[in-house]
From Swiss-Prot:
Role this protein plays: Catalyzes carboxymethyl transfer from carboxy-S-adenosyl-L-methionine (Cx-SAM) to 5-hydroxyuridine (ho5U) to form 5-carboxymethoxyuridine (cmo5U) at position 34 in tRNAs.
Name by which UniProt lists this protein: tRNA U34 carboxymethyltransferase
Classification via NCBIfam families: PRK15068.1 (NF011650), tRNA 5-methoxyuridine(34)/uridine 5-oxyacetic acid(34) synthase CmoB (TIGR00452)
Superkingdom of origin: Bacteria
Subunit organization: Homotetramer.
Species lineage: Bacteria, Pseudomonadati, Pseudomonadota, Gammaproteobacteria, Moraxellales
Keyword presence, Transmembrane helix: no
Binding site for carboxy-S-adenosyl-L-methionine: 101, 119, 124, 144, 166-168, 207-208, 227, 231, 346
Any one GO molecular function term: transferase activity, transferring alkyl or aryl (other than methyl) groups
Keywords, ordered alphabetically: Transferase, tRNA processing
Family: Belongs to the class I-like SAM-binding methyltransferase superfamily. CmoB family.
Classification via Gene3D superfamilies: Vaccinia Virus protein VP39 (3.40.50.150)
Enzyme's top EC category: transferase
InterPro entries for this protein: CmoB, Mo5U34_MeTrfas-like, SAM-dependent_MTases_sf
Length: 353
């Protein structure tokens, strides 16, 4: 017997946007595009694995969840699982591999299912969170949100509504698998609309597909997160402008990206690959990135964290069995990538529109 997790989540997304459209007309454009966005991610002509991913989510068992902790480093869904349920959940969740962003835990005790993801995404969140101020009552957009781990943490931090976007068919279904167990535990208790009142939503699109408005007072978000995306963009300035266009005046951008050491004129443009990735285009210094943000109209730009990625934070696991950071570094000099570039270093900058 299949569950209705995705149907319910999509209905909740529609209801949330309908409510927003009463005060922010731009939301009507989101609503107009939503049927196509949600249809495309299930189209097997676009994504050969889409039917298998959908089946995995729809066949997750119904369990009695006692509590969901969105503030734990391991996003934990507390439930008493039988041995059979544990094995069933494990098998279905493994059909959604590789799991890159997490970690997650379903159940407790001997039968718990622990999804040990490639990234310790909790480490990044713990570095960033002290610098955010409050998310309480804020409307938040998470650009390139992957499996949704950070989006759930934003909801746990008090956001009134979180919209995660990422065009990945796999990541969309990973989010829906976790959503199946979270169910109504992220409900907005102050919501006056019909429906369950989910606070955390997922739209399988890229930033460039989102409607935007230059009209003051017609943007949807108080805070926009963009983490691990900028260096994949061929036009970083266009991307930064698109991020700014989603923010209300006075809104906050949280930008996390690869950086290199250097002055305001230092930008690395990898010749071919960087850490075996062929889609890395620009890696600026913090000073250069600060200048980029100011050039497109952000103010109060500050770097709040710089961290060299370790092989403990990003590594292969049973839930992501492909190559990981260790394989991307020079085996004789871990301060360099296999191509000879500086090893990955990430900075988080916060700016105001």
């Amino acid at each position: 017997m299949t569950n209705h997790t995705i149907t319910t989540a999509e209905r909740e997304l529609y209801l949330a946007l309908i409510q927003r459209a009463q005060y922010r007309p731009i939301a009507t454009q989101w609503l107009a595009n939503l049927p196509q966005w949600l249809s495309d991610v299930k189209d097997k002509r676009r994504y050969a694995h889409a039917p298998a991913y959908l089946s995995a989510v729809e066949n997750l068992p119904q369990i009695k969840v006692k509590n969901v902790d969105l503030n734990s480093d391991i996003l934990t869904i507390d439930a008493d699982l039988t041995d059979g349920q544990s094995k069933q959940i494990t098998a279905l969740m493994k059909q959604l591999m590789p799991w890159r962003k997490g970690p997650f835990q379903i159940g407790s005790g001997d039968n718990k299912v622990f999804i040990d993801t490639e990234w310790h995404s909790d480490w990044k969140w713990n570095r960033i969170k002290p610098h955010l101020g409050t998310l309480q009552g804020r409307y938040v957009l998470d650009v390139g949100g992957g499996s949704g781990y950070h989006g759930w943490r934003m909801a746990g931090a008090g956001a009134k509504q979180v919209v995660i976007i990422d065009p990945s068919c796999l990541f969309y279904h990973q989010f829906m698998a976790i959503r199946h167990f979270v169910a109504g535990f992220d409900t907005d208790m102050d919501s006056d609309r019909t429906g369950v009142g989910y606070r955390t939503h997922y739209i399988p699109v890229g930033l460039e597909q989102l409607p935007s408005s230059s009209d003051q007072g017609n943007q949807l978000f108080d805070t926009v997160f963009c983490m691990g995306v900028l260096y994949h963009r061929q036009s970083p300035f266009e991307h930064l402008i698109q991020l700014k266009n989603q923010l209300i005046n006075g809104g906050q951008l949280v930008l996390e990206t690869l950086v290199i050491e250097g002055d305001a004129n230092t930008v690395l443009v990898p010749h071919n690959r960087y850490a075996k990735m062929n889609n890395v285009y620009f890696i600026p210094s913090v000073a250069a990135l600060t200048g980029w943000l100011e050039k497109v109209g952000f103010s109060e730009v500050k770097c709040v964290d710089i961290d060299i990625t370790s092989i403990k934070e990003q590594r292969a696991t049973d839930w992501m069995s492909y190559q990981s950071l260790k394989d991307f570094l020079d085996p004789n000099d871990p301060t360099k990538t296999v191509e000879g570039y500086p090893a990955p270093m990430r900075a988080t900058l916060i700016a105001t529109k």
